[in-house]
Amino acid sequence: MTLFSSLLSRVSKDGKESIRGNYKPKKHPRGSSRHTMRKSLKKNLAGGTVLKESVKCPDGEDENEWIAVNTIEIFNTMNMCYSFIQGFCTEASCPQMTGAKATYLWTDGKGKPQELSAPQYIDNLVNWISEQIDNPEIFPVDDSDFPKNYRPAVIKIISRVLRVYAHIYHAHWDHIQKLDCYQHTNTSLKHLQYFAEHFSLIGEKDLAVMKHVFDTL
């Protein structure tokens, strides 16, 4: 049984959680360089390699490809962590998308920012990130060159993923602890932090939002 399956099994047995029905981790084509790099990343993480070391691009690998692998992995684990508490994150319990120091408004860059409940905001966000990752003009495939807007797109994805963690730690940390999922959630957030800092993919403003959490990890 995988770590993900084991955790979800434990959550389901508690009888209080519904798992994201649309949770489908992004995968890399078998045999591709990204598939190989992800196997290396997962092996290092599972083997206890220091997180700060595990996020560094391996010698001889393309840095942009490595960033793509980590970005997709971070997106997948964010989905997993949210799935733990999804049953508690409802329109009634979370009418706003809040963190410890902010209320986030949804915008797709086309209309005016609007206030949404946390579950609706996160559903919109997951769909938006999926579209970015699946867009070959942003995340190229078949050894195509990476476009100029690639790094800015990754920076935006990372900042938005961090908002989901901000909500989890602010509104649902008691649930995470009760379900005994806190170690995995903390490790997932640390992976994001070390990766984003190492490749300068996160600004001080975004880091400050979670500083009170980062300082305790």
UniProtKB/Swiss-Prot annotation:
Keyword annotations of the record: Metal-binding, Zinc
Pfam families associated with the record: Mob1_phocein (PF03637)
Region entry Disordered, spans: 15-38
Domain of life: Eukaryota
Residue spans of biased composition, Basic residues class: 23-38
SUPFAM superfamilies to which the protein is assigned, alphabetical: Mob1/phocein
GO molecular function terms listed in the Swiss-Prot or TrEMBL record: metal ion binding; protein kinase activator activity
GO cellular component: cytoplasm; nucleus
Cross-referenced PANTHER family: MPS ONE BINDER KINASE ACTIVATOR-LIKE MOB
Protein family: Belongs to the MOB1/phocein family.
Protein name per UniProt: MOB kinase activator-like 2
Organism (species): Dictyostelium discoideum
Taxon lineage: Eukaryota, Amoebozoa, Evosea, Eumycetozoa, Dictyostelia
Gene transcribed to yield this protein: mob2
